[in-house]
């Protein structure tokens, strides 16, 4: 095997943007930021919460529908 070809595998802190929870894991990255973690995820907490990404999907679908309609009219 070749020596010194593997990335450094160190302990990093993972930060949750939603609830502010932090925990330590190991990774090749310097730091990790997640949108939602097991501390605030609805599946693990049993509480229903709104996730911001749903609005982004709806916005994308609206834009795509407009462009598809304009392409259909052009033909």
From Swiss-Prot:
One of its GO terms (cellular component) is ribosome. Pfam families: Ribosomal_L31. SUPFAM superfamilies: L28p-like (SSF143800). Gene3D superfamilies: Ribosomal protein L31. Keywords: Ribonucleoprotein, Ribosomal protein, RNA-binding, rRNA-binding. One of its GO terms (biological process) is translation. GO terms for molecular function: rRNA binding; structural constituent of ribosome. Belongs to the bacterial ribosomal protein bL31 family. Type A subfamily. Part of the 50S ribosomal subunit. Binds the 23S rRNA. This is Large ribosomal subunit protein bL31. The gene is rpmE.
